[in-house]
């Protein structure tokens, strides 16, 4: 039974109402510093920890709760007579409920004007110590680190005579250990990122020790293949526009491959300002287009490769209305992603309950780093978020691209970034015409892209081509020109750039260099 609670929080969200409810249930309240003042000002009967222990706060508040009367009351096992006798001998009542959250270390170091001294002062000592004590003794002590759990604890107390059951206590304890591990990980990441000057402003992007924290969203039926087990985890600092924040409106449970492909589709479609549609198959775009609206964009994207679009993942950057829904519903689709779906669109898909509908807010979707596991290690890099500005482009051929060609080139370049290397993308009039992906030879990607267009009945005459990396020889360029391309955009940087540029001039096409490569593996 909970008779006495100790409350000490930095995040005071909901704490007054929670403490009042505890007091109404007859629970004695102990508290520290600002929390105690807040509760007292609200008219609640509260005892300062300093008065409770008979020992004042000291060292500018660094020592408040580090006292046997606090930790003895938390750690004592109620089922061990010798523990309870020791408490009685020293006049220590039990503390049955601990409500603590920690100094805002992560928020502090995120500030541009944060100093090392500021960071150090926001490393909580007493809070984690109490939390770990209570979590260790969770059989007898209820510990709350998250304001979202206040209602859960109160409901259980009211239903069970001020008692919280072991399953809840265990869940809350595991939450505490996860929280303190993440807190210590953030401190380690920060301190090991400091350079020799030990100044906040001189932090390295890549700390000497990297701690990562994720919460499990769900277990998955299997992984990339049926013989592999899998689960999906969410980054604790997930941006609003991230796939992990999806809201599923209908459909079967997402699979491992659904999630991986959906991320590729969503990240690609968000890069367009005009209404856009992206169709993904095996993490590669097989159709991308912009249009007057979602239905128009889908119709154009689907034309690129109707065969590959079968069973694909489709993403829109605008609301899916009834017209778009009716067009998509004619095909077999695994997942449909959009910022929103109209009521009429939802009605269209109500007859196709296996189709997974995901709503995600538009916005940034990834944190600062891209991670890839290798045997025994982890590759960490900044995101490939570089967007080439028109002022950075260099026309290196005798012929300048027309305004329309430049629009097509920039569209193709945007798509090529999301195609597995080696990538060759033919585009025209705001849509992909042929996509060559993932080949070991760039010239083979060029051939495949032109074959794809031919199979779809699309002409490449007057098309624009993007290559995610430079042409090592002129052969790849010769292939795309033979297919009908009149302009090419590529990074440049080959030892044979002069030869490739000369070939472009020989063909009478325009070539634009970006100076930026977009390998994708």
Swiss-Prot record:
- Per the record, the gene is purH
Source domain of life: Bacteria
Q: What HAMAP family does the record tag this protein with? A: PurH
Domain MGS-like, first and last residues per copy: 1-145
What's the protein here called?
Bifunctional purine biosynthesis protein PurH
Its cellular-component GO annotations read: cytosol
Keyword annotations for this protein?
Hydrolase, Multifunctional enzyme, Purine biosynthesis, Transferase
Any coiled-coil regions, as ranges: none
Which molecular-function annotation in GO is an example for this chain? Answer: phosphoribosylaminoimidazolecarboxamide formyltransferase activity
């Amino acid at each position: 039974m909970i008779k006495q609670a100790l409350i000490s929080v930095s995040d005071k969200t909901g704490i007054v109402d929670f403490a009042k409810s505890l007091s109404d249930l007859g629970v004695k309240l102990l508290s520290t510093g600002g929390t105690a003042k807040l509760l007292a000002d609200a008219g609640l009967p509260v005892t300062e920890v300093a008065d409770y222990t008979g020992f004042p706060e000291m060292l500018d508040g660094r020592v408040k709760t580090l006292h046997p009367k606090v930790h003895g009351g938390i750690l004592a096992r109620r089922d061990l007579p010798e523990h309870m006798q020791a408490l009685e001998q020293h006049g220590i009542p039990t503390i049955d409920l601990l409500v603590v959250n920690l100094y805002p270390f992560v928020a502090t170091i995120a500030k541009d004007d944060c100093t090392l001294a500021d960071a150090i002062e926001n490393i909580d000592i007493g809070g984690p110590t109490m939390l770990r004590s209570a979590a260790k003794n969770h059989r007898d002590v209820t510990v709350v680190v998250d304001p979202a759990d206040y209602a859960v604890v109160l409901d259980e107390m009211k239903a069970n005579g001020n008692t919280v059951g072991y399953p809840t206590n265990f869940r809350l304890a595991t939450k505490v250990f996860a929280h303190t591990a993440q807190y210590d990980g953030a401190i380690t990441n920060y301190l090991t990122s400091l350079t020799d000057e030990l100044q906040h402003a001189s932090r390295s992007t890549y700390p000497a020790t990297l701690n990562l924290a994720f919460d499990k969203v769900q277990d998955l039926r299997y992984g990339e293949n049926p013989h592999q087990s899998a689960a999906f985890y969410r980054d604790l600092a997930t941006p609003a526009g991230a796939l992990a924040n999806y809201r599923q409106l209908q459909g079967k449970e997402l699979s491992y491959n659904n999630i991986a492909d959906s991320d590729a589709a969503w990240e690609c479609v968000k890069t367009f300002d005009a209404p856009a549609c992206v169709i993904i198959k095996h993490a590669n775009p097989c159709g991308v287009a912009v249009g007057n609206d979602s239905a128009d964009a889908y119709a154009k994207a689907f034309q690129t490769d109707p065969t590959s679009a079968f069973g694909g993942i489709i993403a829109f950057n605008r609301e899916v209305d009834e017209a778009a829904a009716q067009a998509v519903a004619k095909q077999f689709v695994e997942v449909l992603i959009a910022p929103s779906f109209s009521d009429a669109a939802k009605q269209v898909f109500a007859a196709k309950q296996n189709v997974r509908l995901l709503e995600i807010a538009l916005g940034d979707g990834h944190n600062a780093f891209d991670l890839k596991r290798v045997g025994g290690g982890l590759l960490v890099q900044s995101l490939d978020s570089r967007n080439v500005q028109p002022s950075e482009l260099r026309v290196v051929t005798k012929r300048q691209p027309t305004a329309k060609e430049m629009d097509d080139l920039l569209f193709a370049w945007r798509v090529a970034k999301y195609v597995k290397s080696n990538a060759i993308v033919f585009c025209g009039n705001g849509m992909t015409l042929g996509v060559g992906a993932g080949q070991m030879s760039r010239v083979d990607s060029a051939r495949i892209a032109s074959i794809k267009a031919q199979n779809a009945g699309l002409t490449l005459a007057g098309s624009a081509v993007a290559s995610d990396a430079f042409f090592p020889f002129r052969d790849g360029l010769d292939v795309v020109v033979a297919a009908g391309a009149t302009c090419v955009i590529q990074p440049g940087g080959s030892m044979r750039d002069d030869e490739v540029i000369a070939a472009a001039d020989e063909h009478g096409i325009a070539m634009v260099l970006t100076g930026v490569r977009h390998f994708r593996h």
